[in-house]
Amino acid sequence: RLFAAGPLPTPIEFRGVRIGVPICEDIWLPEVCAHLKATGAEILVSPNGSPYEIDKDDLRVGGVAAKRVAETGLPLAYLNRVGGQDELVFDGASFVLNADGTLAHQLPDWDACVVATQWERRQGGWACLPGARAALDPHPADIYHAMVVGLRDYVNANRFPGVVLGLSGGIDSALSAAVAVDALGAERVRCVMLPSRYTADISLNDAT
């Protein structure tokens, strides 16, 4: 009701290079990248706010990005946001694919960073020289890291001084405490045991 589809984007020129800028979901379907190629793009640079999901890295690199590169014959730099916003968490893991489908750069997940890439013009077009190849979090470490980043950024964005957790002695509250300490530091986490007459002694011991 509020927005209508605009025209397909055209490349921008930067230092003599025509760069296509498909934004986020523009690369999930072929039309935008194909149009950028047809209108003279030499390199694709795709800024993204792509939230974390299990196995999302494989889908981005080997699925969506690889398809657009194969279809257009253009290298693609995929730039993803890092951090949490409310219920969403963004894992970063930016990368560069060359026109032949090879991975030239893989940036780390969960860590905002700036990396200078080197490019050279070859007979078939531009190519990114090989560079950083960070190892991404394995599963299930990626899930834990997502919880830590999401909690950290939510608490800090809302300027909360810290968190208070009720401990039961069970594994669920123990995990919650571990996530909170890794996200905020022990000095910003206060754990409280709230026993009742039904609480077993072993639960009290585990909680303390």
Predicted regions and their residues:
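Short glycine/serine/threonine-rich phosphate/pyrophosphate-binding segments
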Residues: 173-176, 200-202
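Enzyme catalytic cores with a strong preference for nitrogen-chemistry domains
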Residues: 1-166, 177-188, 193, 198
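ATP-dependent adenylate-handling ligase core
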Residues: 196-208
